[in-house]
Amino acid sequence: MSRIGKLPITVPAGVDVTIDGRTVQVKGPKGSLSHTIAAPIEIAKGEDGVLNVTRPNDERQNKALHGLSRTLVANMITGVTQGYVKKLEISGVGYRVLAKGSNLEFSLGYSHSITVEAPEGITFKVEAPTRFSVEGIDKQKVGEVAANIRKLRKPDPYKAKGVKYEGEVIRRKVGKAGK
């Protein structure tokens, strides 16, 4: 069995999990999420609020889907209870971020400012002009929005200017040798 897939998922108090055919819906204090499980994988509610994910056989595809399905459901439960946060930093002279309602406005050295609108279920928090965070209950959506913001101005390996994740180490390159 998949080492990840065979682990049972404990459902904390205050979280309601509904299984309707292949669709799993999770409701918690922060909101609700739903996901459709891939065809051969089965999910069942056990006693004491435990979810078990099983697969019919040991085919390679089923092994991969087993661990994936279990992790996606576990991430949904974590999302509706705690939520997910991706923190980002901006470094560079004149680079900054401003909160404009629920949107972010970036000054990243271009001739124009860039506005990023918050998708449904995502909120932005600006802690300082060079530090902000992306928050939400859907782990995939939080990571995707953070990656798209980072893509606006990737960190430069020569001067380390740009948008980077908090704690991300930028490998610096040596510039061209002068005479």
Curated annotation (Swiss-Prot):
InterPro entries per the UniProt record, alphabetical: Ribosomal_uL6-like, Ribosomal_uL6-like_a/b-dom_sf, Ribosomal_uL6_a/b-dom, Ribosomal_uL6_bac-type, Ribosomal_uL6_CS
Keyword Protein biosynthesis tagged: no
PROSITE patterns reported in the protein's UniProt record: RIBOSOMAL_L6_1 (PS00525)
SUPFAM superfamilies reported in the protein's UniProt record: Ribosomal protein L6
Cellular component annotations (GO), alphabetically ordered: cytosolic large ribosomal subunit
Disulphide bond pairs: none
Molecular function GO labels: rRNA binding; structural constituent of ribosome
Keywords: Ribonucleoprotein, Ribosomal protein, RNA-binding, rRNA-binding
Entry keyword annotation includes Protein biosynthesis: no
GO biological process: cytoplasmic translation
PANTHER family: 60S/50S RIBOSOMAL PROTEIN L6/L9 (PTHR11655), LARGE RIBOSOMAL SUBUNIT PROTEIN UL6M (PTHR11655:SF14)
Protein family per UniProt: Belongs to the universal ribosomal protein uL6 family.
Subunit description: Part of the 50S ribosomal subunit.
Function (record text): This protein binds to the 23S rRNA, and is important in its secondary structure. It is located near the subunit interface in the base of the L7/L12 stalk, and near the tRNA binding site of the peptidyltransferase center.
HAMAP family: Ribosomal_uL6_B
Name of the molecule in the record: Large ribosomal subunit protein uL6
Organism listed in the record: Streptomyces avermitilis (strain ATCC 31267 / DSM 46492 / JCM 5070 / NBRC 14893 / NCIMB 12804 / NRRL 8165 / MA-4680)
Lineage, top ranks: Bacteria, Bacillati, Actinomycetota, Actinomycetes, Kitasatosporales
